[in-house]
């Protein structure tokens, strides 16, 4: 049998030949200890050249491809490939793992880099987005992540001279990144004209924002900031692969084989051409270079490492070499010397010295080499080639002996016979040829038995036989030398084989897994002397087995290091070493063999540490020495805890059923009942599959769990309190070291762990997101700060948490088999143990990972199943209890001894100050001394020892003990049978709590007149429970079979019980003794009922689909009810005892008459009229509403009606207990629901007086007692029930503003489309017509006239070089709220419009701007904490949440200096609609516009997301932290108010409860304010304000406003509250009100705006002033004393602002907009001077040349002329029906041109007076008119139209001018056209969907500004006829800039916004002289 166990010898990696030079760069460095660190295959290597020694880091599970050295040069980071690749940070000195970073990248990790102080690490993934990720590597935590680039990234580096900046480069790009908050923002490097767009391969950062980079063409590109400033051409002749910066300068290495050294300013120092040196060769390519002092390390493509001493740079020293690229298959060992020969597809054959660890010979062949062999005397070396030939060389000097090619396909294997006379050659064409060595390798035979390619050969010792393996796994034998096949097994039996390298054969059966027919083992080699076998497989694993190993699935030891397939493995000639070669990693590994006898001395070579386990996990088999599992444990391991439907699935399921629900809920439904129930007592304790889940709290209460309830039991008062935060079975529980907090873990799809306070029963933290299916074990650390947990997913994941923060610290896969226990080391918080099935593992934390080592059992014991574990009195000592009753004692990871403790498993153990206590399946509690040597005392749990005060009865003696705990002078014991007992130290035992044992519980009956109930269960017991305050089990009786139903007779004397075998019995209700029993049915009895009154009949329903009716007195069956098509589920009698109502499994509701059982058909209307004695039916019209929307996945299993017929209680498959008002007609009734049971509620019953409800949990085995709190009965705290699932269908109220805000869809700037309905080909895509007069360059013709009349500029035409934002007229009030705040004691106000945050000085009106947002700002808040003064947070729109630059984001910035402090990229798709700071100012809350309206909490300074959760399915308008809290906040929205708590990383919410106020309905809530003592005020759509105490509505302030209350503000200093609403101004009312702290008294303020309705969107209160923002884009300051209003900011109410005109001589301008106003603005005074209400939307506006008249064009086709002086109308006219798009006075003031969307321009002669008769018009315009310009002489008009065409017309005739030459000679008075050759350059490449909307040329005629649909203002030179002209661009507007103009003297540019209704004034910066 020993053959099946793992061998007891061992391999230790001694040397690796090779270095990974292919496909990697920059992977070779000097460490601080002057050692060399690099990697090969899956191993990190630290090589000491001085001692010629290697150390290995083996924490990776696949190929390493990237490496970075920490700045202190001791720590190394390496990254690997794989599906779930990870990064290891390890110590190059000890080669131990320091940290593991995982769970972020996929595919692989391409680049790594540490920052300057080594705190952060950046990594780049190999995924399609090439994700860039920044880590806090010590904590294993990701700080930020962003998509890197669409193509490969080759190098990344931190800028060591600027904080938070990085540079990355790769295919055709270089990117400069800045890290702020959690946002990584890239800027692409601009190649410009300086250099070609190139692939950049490597880079290094220098001072002064300089970056040096190496390009693919061999140039070095030098960058300043993001711009390329120069190139150093021809630095190398080909691509520069590596660049290394050091103190002296830079070293570069390239594909040309050269190393160049540069000084710090990148001036060349020297060049070293490696190809020219002694060791060089053609094609040498440098992949890595490292320069330290006078040494340079070089790594090459062909896996060499050179060291160069700078002084002797032509003599490089070769310190490592390996095979080059190409698969490596050939391996042979020398028969007499310690040499190994390898041959590869790189065509080289190499001989290695195993003693000196060096390459001693190398020879290049013509063909790739696939196999090798050395003959017995060591003279000849044969090589098999890929082309079918083989070559024989002399080993001595590598000269050729012979070259033979007999085959066309690859030679896979060749071997010399032991006597040296023959050579056997196996080929891919399935033949083996035999050659005679002495006859100069003449072919002497061939073996042709195989049908597939030959894989392995072995000779017999006498050279007479050959055995082969082929690709089909067949093993064949041949006689030598002829090659005749041997088929007789007898002949072969006696053959002794000289070597064993075959993979199939009896002797190696054990190397294959038991049930597998795969052929992934590539090579084996037998060591006959050591009786071991080594194998190599496709997964990079080397295994040691015993030899021979005859039975499949033998145990082994495994060793990792190779990354992919290991192609060959051989013992050295003296069996000292094993040599293995990697196919893809081209590496040669040399392992030292340590035989068994040496192991004793070498305990230090305990299993080496690695993330992949080096011990034989998979090699489990039915080993004889593993005891069979104990039945109890066996049962437990079969529990999967999987659910068909998890509670988490309900929201999605409901979503799917939405349509069904909508149709049903259109009808008004009954309210939920007024009654509520409260959980009062639970009979039950979960012992059957849990351990150590029972503890004393600080104050001596007992805490444990059952079902989904955490129970705190007070044993003095016999009362319980409950933690009801879980929604499914709790599987584990542990107590905090201070005994006040408890952690419980539950079942779930994403199961949670709750940490809660046993005193307040409030959750402190909820941990989730890292387990699946359930959490099976938890444990606190000794300091109470950390928590370890284990999941029940397939890998039994182990997680270490910082539970207060709710953060995962580390995670690892635990084991394939179930883990029962996790324990944290009390002395070292970074260590823990897990124990479970055949498993004991010792873990330590390494960054984000955990490194586990299996307990080392040695010869002492066997690999047993561990059920419990504790730590001893030092950090090394641990103790575990096994399934066989032993206690194992461990030191470090070694088993030192075992002690027999119990018969059967040890389920629980506990460490005391001076010893231990253990409990086992044998029902004995044992006390031990502190070294487990003596058992001091035992207590047997027996009925005899029960003390008189016990609350129940022991079911049996010596029940299996599952939990033990000590405290308060007692031992607390929990048993498998669901009992909790207290053992006094002196011996007596008190039973405290008990419940049913394992097995479903269905039967429940309440007594007709006493507070007792009976239950019967599959555990084969019938029990009677006392429901009065003594809460105990009164009687119990064992049954021969389990039962599913029971019933008391009406007089309470008899109890009928239905059993599962089809029998039933009647028992005496007091003594439980049998009265009578019957067995008439085969299937289980499902319901049993006595008829009412005297109880004359007994109805017995069974799963056979029959109901039998018995006469109780005569004990005879009198009737059978037939006709049901399925099993019976419920029966009820009518009050007369004549009629039975029956429910069946097919959802039939049937009626039968007693006693004969005749079927009756009763119409449903009649059913209601029948008086029923009981109602437990779940079918029928009266209870239609109890079926949930998701009825398909969940059944309602039970119901029970109160005796007053008012309230129906139901229980369902999801564990919900619900109360409905009866009758529940109509679908989906409203209810109150309660969670406590975990899964199926199998039965519910009211007690005889309806004072209590008793419910049974089917699989949680618990009996719960609830008290019924009648309507009208009001206790201090209403019960927490969850309200109905369906959102209230009451109308939440209507208001146009609210509806618009709710339905608005925000588009991001990048996706914006054109605002005008343009058609046609864009100008830059049109074919250009050849101009007629392409004049010769020299010409006598007169010069072309000016394009533009340039006036009032004089001689100095200075171009404009920049625009600076100076003023904004506008405020976003239309769909935002609470976005105007005071700063600096009211001197400044802060608000926003478009994408700009505005700081506005109240006194001077001057503004400064925050312009870092790249899209519209939607919300703004100010931090109120004095530590964070003037800190503002703003949230913006965005598109999807891929964390790229267009993702929605929040900026936190300083309002005074506009510095960005943090940027938070959000996962809220669409945008961020609300932000709020917490009381300490450190947390920020944000709400998204995504469909789930996600709520997220951030630690904004670190950019860390703490918690996130779906908020509500409808729009949330505002969420705000309570001003005194960092954990409590409130959200309001459409028909929604929720009260939230942040617990760790979890967000818990409670819906606002309305039930306490009559007629309260859930309205749409719009605003929030707070008061003391947990008061919250919410403003509603109707104008009421709701007042909430905690989460319960306690008062309504009716009509606080007459319209929606949009804004509320809580003043922190005095608690007064400001509200703002939507109202018509009236004498007593006002749109703004100031209230006292409790919203009882108020003072109203009127806003004197002159509007018909004031709609307030934002309020804020300063010192004596109230700041108000309105829907009309006004910001008003109201004095509290005098109520005086001062308007600070004006803006247009609705946009777009199409019309814009600047005054001809003054700094005024006019704007006209959709809101029907024209406004006059003064730039110098920074204010609005005047506004005219036109009553219709205005589209265009224009000043006359003198500035005395204004023309306005309207949307309805009318135009108006006003006199500026009086604003009186001079004239108006309407000749068109459609909008006027542009209107112009001619320069001589004679004509007015009016362009409209009717494709026409009308001319009016103004000299004819205000009658305004049209004198002519332009026809034939192909599309609507956009802009018009007059010529300087008023004779021509240029018109641009909606089909991208420009036309010129004569004035006033309207004739179309076609002559290009004539047009070219016109001088224009103004230029606002976006069309024409002169402005072709303004059209950008990216304008497929978007247009340039407006343009304006400066008065100087040399500058041009444009506005476009992306919201950009651009500055060009004029004219700009070249396509895609250079320009500067200015952001700030929302999408669509609709108009733009220069003011007089070109002092300013004014731009008008479409979506943002704002006017931006930009100051022009002219070029200095």
Curated annotation (Swiss-Prot):
It holds the Pfam family Beta-prop_EML. Gene3D superfamilies: YVTN repeat-like/Quinoprotein amine dehydrogenase. The keyword Ligase does not apply. SUPFAM superfamilies: Quinoprotein alcohol dehydrogenase-like (SSF50998), Soluble quinoprotein glucose dehydrogenase (SSF50952), WD40 repeat-like (SSF50978). May modify the assembly dynamics of microtubules, such that microtubules are slightly longer, but more dynamic. It comes from Homo sapiens. One of its GO terms (cellular component) is microtubule. Belongs to the WD repeat EMAP family. Keywords: Cytoplasm, Cytoskeleton, Microtubule, Repeat, WD repeat. Residues 1326-1337 have a biased composition (Basic and acidic residues). Residues 609-633, 1274-1297, 1326-1355 are annotated as: Disordered. This is Echinoderm microtubule-associated protein-like 5.
